């Protein structure tokens, strides 16, 4: 009798950025590491995706976006009983210690400075998703 193992599903990352270039970069980095990636262009769209698919293992979001900032998205996720366990990582091209501290205090898992390096994404995913 042979035993077949069911492969583990690929971890699912929701990437949120109003810049198509940054969404593409993050998506390629994650997909090359065997992650399933959904990309959206706003915090509002991210909440719509999360309302339909709760099987998200991590959210990576830009800090500065129109309509709803990444910080606002972080707060909404952490205030939600259904979503609060999803790790949220923020990114920004501005290296502001006050902004970074504020995000971490609000519950962000980490804060990346753009341009994001492949080693940053690999380290982050190994630490956050694989724990």
Swiss-Prot record:
What is one GO biological process annotated to this record?
cytokinin-activated signaling pathway
Task: Spell out the post-translational modification annotation for this entry.
Answer: Two-component system major event consists of a His-to-Asp phosphorelay between a sensor histidine kinase (HK) and a response regulator (RR). In plants, the His-to-Asp phosphorelay involves an additional intermediate named Histidine-containing phosphotransfer protein (HPt). This multistep phosphorelay consists of a His-Asp-His-Asp sequential transfer of a phosphate group between first a His and an Asp of the HK protein, followed by the transfer to a conserved His of the HPt protein and finally the transfer to an Asp in the receiver domain of the RR protein.
Q: Which residues carry this modification: 4-aspartylphosphate?
A: 62
What is this protein's expression induced by? Answer: By cytokinin in roots and leaves.
One Pfam family from the UniProt entry?
Response_reg
Looking up InterPro entries in the UniProt record yields: ARR-like (IPR045279), CheY-like_superfamily (IPR011006), Sig_transdc_resp-reg_receiver (IPR001789)
According to the record, the segments passing through the membrane are: none
> The Response regulatory domain covers which part of the protein?
12-129
Q: In which tissues is it expressed?
A: Expressed in roots, leaf blades, leaf sheaths, shoot apex, flowers and panicles.
Localization, per the record, is: Cytoplasm, Cytosol; Nucleus
Q: Which UniProt keywords apply?
A: Cytokinin signaling pathway, Cytoplasm, Nucleus, Phosphoprotein, Transcription, Transcription regulation, Two-component regulatory system
| Chief place of localization | cytoplasm
Gene3D superfamilies associated with the record: 3.40.50.2300
* Listed GO CC annotations: cytosol; nucleus
Query: Any phenotype upon disruption?
Result: Dwarf, narrow leaf, low tillering, abnormal hull, viviparous and low fertility phenotype.
Q: Would I find Cell wall biogenesis/degradation among this entry's keywords?
A: no
Q: Provide the function of this protein.
A: Functions as a response regulator involved in His-to-Asp phosphorelay signal transduction system. Phosphorylation of the Asp residue in the receiver domain activates the ability of the protein to promote the transcription of target genes. Type-A response regulators seem to act as negative regulators of the cytokinin signaling.
Which protein family is named in the record? Belongs to the ARR family. Type-A subfamily.
What is the protein name for this chain? Two-component response regulator ORR3
Q: What species was this sequence derived from?
A: Oryza sativa subsp. japonica
Q: What gene name does this entry carry? A: RR3
């Amino acid at each position: 009798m042979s035993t077949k193992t069911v492969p583990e599903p690929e971890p699912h990352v929701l990437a949120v950025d109003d810049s198509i270039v940054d969404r593409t970069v993050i998506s390629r980095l994650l997909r090359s590491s065997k992650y399933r990636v959904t990309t959206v262009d706003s915090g509002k769209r991210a909440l719509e995706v999360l309302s339909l698919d709760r099987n998200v293992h991590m959210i990576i979001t830009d800090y500065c976006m129109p309509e709803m900032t990444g910080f606002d998205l972080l707060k909404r996720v952490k205030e939600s009983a259904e979503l609060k366990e999803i790790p949220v990582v923020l990114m920004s091209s501005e290296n502001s210690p006050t902004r970074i501290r504020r995000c971490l205090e609000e519950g962000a898992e980490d804060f990346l400075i753009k341009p994001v390096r492949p080693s940053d994404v690999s380290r982050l995913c190994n630490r956050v998703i694989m724990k």
